[in-house]
Amino acid sequence: MTTQLEQAWELAKQRFAAVGIDVEEALRQLDRLPVSMHCWQGDDVAGFENPEGSLTGGIQSTGNYPGKARNATELRADLEQALRLIPGPKRLNLHAIYLESDTPVARDQIKPEHFKNWVEWAKANRLGLDFNPTCFSHPLSADGFTLSHPDAKIRQFWIDHCKASRRVSAYFGEQLGTPSVMNIWIPDGMKDITVDRLAPRQRLLEALDEVISEKFDPAHHIDAVESKLFGIGAESYTVGSNEFYMGYATSRQTALCLDAGHFHPTEVISDKISAAMLYVPRLLLHVSRPVRWDSDHVVLLDDETQAIASEIVRHNLFDRVHIGLDFFDASINRVAAWVIGTRNMKKALLRALLEPTDQLRQLEASGDYTARLALLEEQKSLPWQAVWEMYCQRHDTPTGSQWLDSVRTYEKEILSKRS
């Protein structure tokens, strides 16, 4: 530990103590908040089922930065490189298309054995795993419908895929000793004016009920459902709207997933957390950065990321909110994208933990909004960076931008050699 870092740390402890914050306790709390990294940043959502196939479902990964992972071995190596540069507890979020098999496997036939390598790898790296059925980039989703499809046979295929995915998710939780959160998102919708908006939602309701009919130990598996405002090719109507899934999660007591990019550009999910928590047992967050639409840019340490973290901490939602990331930028180094986004999420959580929330709440309750605003703004200038650097030091990860040197070396020695 450098003398300069020690001095900054001691000064930071004193500054935060002056406003009633124990920085050691803040770091202990930060170690209770894992962030689930998404595997699909590493290969632009290609997966291993059909890596050369098109990405569909109204989502898009733009850019052609060299060095993307082409198989599971490369993807895990890239993840390990990123993990080494991110302090504190982490998880990994997998999609069904990241299965491994010597022969083709239909999506309704996926089994735990197809993800055994991921589980062994997660054990070795002390990670929890989360999961997602992949209801896009498939011939049977090409017309824009899956779980709400009017054709009963196609609809059943997707029901069976989601049921098989739940068994994989439960296997993750059983093997790793931490529950896997399995999130269901479907692209179902229509491009233009829709006459019958009810029937697809009725079919989706019934399909989801069948999907979750098999009971699993919540210590192993947690169901979540995710809404979206629109997607490319589904601009006019989305079957799984916010109102639909809020009603579903409330009535079935599943977790509700809030994705930062899945709402109107003037809406923010930080404002939805406290409302949803009154009705659902758990929330899954997909922290992202929408630029004019659900563009899934790399997460910044911006106002909304900070507001999301503050909501979790202020309301002590550590055990009810699961923090995941969802972005995929193919225009920059993909390992760096993971590191930037995940470190920013953790920085936001730390800053929230260093806030004198009790004092601010008292000022608010007494109607002293002047002091509330003044202290919130002064809080931004306190030396949280010194606390962050100590956290990185204790977790044997680089402080500041030093991590970029490691990424550049990895790019030169490994990524640049991929064709």
Curated annotation (Swiss-Prot):
One Gene Ontology MF term: manganese ion binding
Residue positions binding Mn(2+): H262, D294, D296
Reaction(s) catalysed by this chain's protein: L-rhamnopyranose = L-rhamnulose
Pfam families, per the entry: RhaA (PF06134)
Gene Ontology CC terms, in alphabetical order: cytoplasm
Keywords: Cytoplasm, Isomerase, Manganese, Metal-binding, Rhamnose metabolism
Cofactors named for this entry: Mn(2+)
GO biological process, one term: L-lyxose metabolic process
Superkingdom in the source lineage: Bacteria
InterPro entries: L-rhamnose_isomerase, Rhamnose_isomerase, Xyl_isomerase-like_sf
Cofactor comment: Binds 1 Mn(2+) ion per subunit.
UniProt-annotated location(s): Cytoplasm
EC main group: isomerase
Pathway: Carbohydrate degradation; L-rhamnose degradation; glycerone phosphate from L-rhamnose: step 1/3
EC number: 5.3.1.14
Principal localisation: cytoplasm
Protein's job: Catalyzes the interconversion of L-rhamnose and L-rhamnulose.
Subunit structure: Homotetramer.
HAMAP family: RhaA
Family of this protein: Belongs to the rhamnose isomerase family.
Name of the protein: L-rhamnose isomerase
Gene (UniProt): rhaA
